[in-house]
A protein has these predicted regions:
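SAM-dependent methyltransferase catalytic region
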Residues: 12, 264-265
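Core catalytic lobe of class I
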Residues: 1-250, 257
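Conserved phosphoryl-transfer catalytic core
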Residues: 256-262
């Protein structure tokens, strides 16, 4: 986090990011296979610095994953942020792929006609481990009591009778919950960065935090600009840092193209 430090006067409303997972991804300017203690100390600096630049009513949405041989890593990272002074307010599960059997849906909910597998994932070639179809999004705040805009990311009621049944159900929107199914693009040419999350992920995080006038979003590992694109669509200001000049060029191009596209529509 070289751009924003505690000495800076700017304060951030929400940070949405996904740091390298230390699982040997092929970055061109970053070693993604550090000694684990070194990696965790590095993330501790990220936690400490981010806490200083975040507003008192700010949010930090941290997307992290792991691997079967080190399944505790996401929780160790979470503990580091809590140790820095954050409160873990929500734990969101990003589901990349899911299998649904018709028998589990029931006759009343006629959603699918056949057993279905939806989404994509990288299979694990192992006789010991199941393929990992999800990652975590840890939602940190400073006090743990931040009001969030749950209906901004809400979904429609499957059973419309609930709209009149529940006092809180004033519209055809309900809490999405903490399980988010967000598939990602599998075409590598469209994912020149080895570890990008789908644009919908930061989009939902920002909306959940709440979009107000002059909202500023920061992504300290902005990569090819995915968080920035979500910000443009939400009409909020954004800042980002990235160490790889190639990714910066791609991010700038993506941002310019999005502005052009939005002006036409």
């Amino acid at each position: 986090m070289s751009l924003l430090k505690k000495e800076d006067t700017i304060k951030i409303d929400a940070i949405v990011t996904s740091p390298p997972y230390n699982i040997n991804k092929p970055y061109s300017k970053y070693n993604d296979k550090r000694d684990k203690n070194e990696y965790l100390l590095w993330l501790q600096k990220v936690a400490n610095n981010s806490l200083q630049i975040l507003k008192e009513d700010g949010s930090f949405f941290l997307n992290v994953g792991g691997r079967p041989t080190d399944y505790m890593l996401p929780f160790e990272i979470c503990s580091i942020f809590i140790g820095a002074g954050y409160k873990l307010q929500n734990t969101i599960h990003w589901i990349k792929s899911i299998s649904i059997e018709v028998a589990d849906i029931g006759k009343k909910n006629n959603i699918i006609k056949t057993d279905s597998s939806i989404g994509h994932f990288k299979p694990i070639i192992s006789q010991r481990f199941l393929s990992d179809l999800h990652e975590y999004i840890f939602h940190f705040t400073k006090k743990g009591d931040l009001a969030i805009d749950k209906l901004a990311v809400g979904v429609t009621y499957q059973d419309k009778s609930n709209i009149g049944r529940w006092k809180s159900a004033k519209t055809d929107k309900r809490d999405r919950g903490n399980i988010w199914f967000i598939p990602y693009n599998t075409i590598q040419e469209k994912r020149p960065h080895p570890a990008t999350f789908p644009e919908k992920l930061p989009y939902l995080c920002i909306k959940l935090h709440g979009v107000k006038k002059n909202t500023i979003i920061y992504d300290p590992f902005i990569g090819i600009g995915t968080t920035a694109l979500a910000c443009i669509n939400l009409n909020v200001e954004f800042l980002g840092t990235e160490i790889d000049n190639r990714y910066i060029e791609i991010a700038n191009e993506n941002i310019q193209l999005r502005y052009i596209k939005n002006k036409k529509t």
